[in-house]
Amino acid sequence: MSAKNAKKQPNNSVEFLIDDDYGITEAIATLDNGDFGTRTIRFETGQLARQAGGSVTTYLDEDTMLLSTTTASNQPREGFDFFPLTVDVEERMYAAGKIPGSFFRREGRPSTEAILACRLIDRPLRPTFVKGLRNEVQVVVTVLSMDPEEYYDVVAINGASASTQLSGLPVSGPVGGVRMALIADDKHPKGQWVAFPNNEQHERALFEMVVAGRIVKKGRKDDVAIMMVEAGAGVNVAERIKEGAPAPQESTVAEGLEAAKPFIKSLCEAQAGLAERAAKETQEFPLFPPYGDDVYAAVEKAASKKLEKLLTIPGKQDRDDATNEYMEQVEAKLIEDFDDLDEADASKQIRNAFNAVMKDIVRTKILTEGFRIDGRGVTDIRDLGVEVDLIPRAHGSSLFERGETQILGVTTLDMLKMEQQIDSLTPVESKRYMHHYNFPPYSTGETGRVGSPKRREIGHGALAERALLPVIPSREDFPYAIRQVSEALGSNGSTSMGSVCASTLSLYNAGVPLKAPVAGIAMGLVSGEVNGKEKFVALTDILGAEDAFGDMDFKVAGTSEFITALQLDTKLDGIPSHVLADALEQARDARAAILDTMSEVIESPDEMSGLAPRITSVTIPVNKIGELIGPKGKTINAITEETGADVSIEEDGTVYISAATGEAADAAIDRVNSIANPQLPKVGERFLGTVVKTVAFGAFVSLTPGRDGLVHISKLGGDERIEKVEDVVNVGDKIQVEIADIDNRGKISLVPVEED
């Protein structure tokens, strides 16, 4: 990557407009993409949804328009020990000039894309609220207008942050979000980062990142603290690399983050300026800290020594059982010391303080001793288990284990007509590769609801899908719809990255010719002051507890050559660039080790299962598509009925044929070719035909789909004269015939012959 391109500062600008007559205030951020033009993000308040706590209409250029509102309940929620923030994205189909395709012709449950947008908003927005808030807060983003070539999700991050800034809620400064695409072309062979890429730019991007952050003070200067990253390689990145384009590696991520910061800064400045001019006064809300300082001190004194020993138990279940039992003992011992609190509140505070003490012990030992709960070093990976071909009738299956995390991967192949049709406001209309992730409650030894996927499951499935998508073969090379299911059977740290590994194994087992195998690893980071100096320790292959106790977790997936997906969330106000670089290198080493272990079991596609459909393709002239389909689908349906094969026709004339056996597929191909790529029959050729129609003067016999001939009544009786055609043959009868003549108009005359 070009350091020059990464460090060049865009010429962004922010301006404000106030219309006193209508009570409308605007903030306009103009973002400079250099040779790729500019994008304009406009925030407007005062016209729509005036009764909401905070309301902002956000525009991307002219045609994409979102309404964001933030509203809080008047009273805190009783019995809640967490902040009840909900984020909803409402896709209105009128935004794209469409009527919903559902039976009732109105919007129903949110699309997958809307749910993923909710998660993108929630992750950076939630940490900005003051700790201890228990009033219910609801952020609703409604898509009112949508340019069909644009994406609204990152615009929604900014809109949700802006409406929250105006709402009078106790929050820190605004959050800015930007999608960055690395585009390499003849003019920019090493790539240029482009903010808010449209769909055309998205499809040719080498790498793409959604980055959210906020402005923090670093001395006298403003800096941007990165809060969240979602990243992935372009769909065609493998081919682009072969053509000479730069591979997206660890340095690409660092450069992309730096390139995003000026855009985030401009977006935050626009929101802050809007808030200065139009925000409500911050209201007083009751806060409920998880525990008092006196409670923490008492628990620390009573429990820390024994906790240090209990936290060395390597097994998750044994460790959890031991610490939970000890927590009950500590609670029983201390609860009477806090008679100024009611019993329920005292119990809650003691338990929260116990967990906080446990967290501090783990963090301190990591920083000072390099100690981890299960005894590993900071760069060690847990024991790996790899197996394929577990499920008898599945087209491909695998089991991937990393410590106590256990993922079952299952692959199903089908015809292209089974690819998912997407009815949402994104430019993507269909998906050939579908990745579904399930996280049942028993995976953590608990009970709970099962059934339709929760937001977390949808998000994890999307991350794993993004990790695999760059290595999925093209539809021309592998004309199948692919459904990959990841079943989290056991969970103790990063089931999403375990799903990536299990999917590679399962896809190979199903015979899918991946461009390269992909593995994923979850990383953590712990920071703190040791001997007067700030220290950062990156952890490889984090446990669930290390995820909860750490300052940052990021998941990295990729091949041995390039990164395919990355997800990062941090609680820190900025990560030093050298710390992030070292952590990414540590992740690459772990990824390589996992790929080596996987390759010992399977390193290339197996033969396809005999239970998987056989799909072949043939190309026909576009002007023959109608003839192949036939009136009301008559011809194509006849091919399906006669051969047992399914036939799917693409707009470019590619015909995909799926059948249970090779013989059925060959028969269907012959039928298709006889219609669309015909070779005229010759006099003397014999066919076993089907009588399709009888008339007074003879019987019409189908030789091949779309090509019939006539047996005259005089030829049906042999040497005998017959009065009625139906005395000899009826519709549906099979009859052996020979072509006697073909006239100038192509009409075929047939005569019955004895079967050979």
From Swiss-Prot:
Keywords from the UniProt entry: Cytoplasm, Magnesium, Metal-binding, Nucleotidyltransferase, RNA-binding, Transferase
Database matches in Pfam families: KH_1, PNPase, RNase_PH, S1
Annotated ranges, domain KH: 613-672
Enzyme class: transferase
Subcellular location(s) of the protein: Cytoplasm
Cofactor(s) essential for the protein: Mg(2+)
GO terms classed as biological process: mRNA catabolic process; RNA processing
Coiled coil (UniProt feature): none
Name of this protein: Polyribonucleotide nucleotidyltransferase
Record organism: Corynebacterium aurimucosum (strain ATCC 700975 / DSM 44827 / CIP 107346 / CN-1)
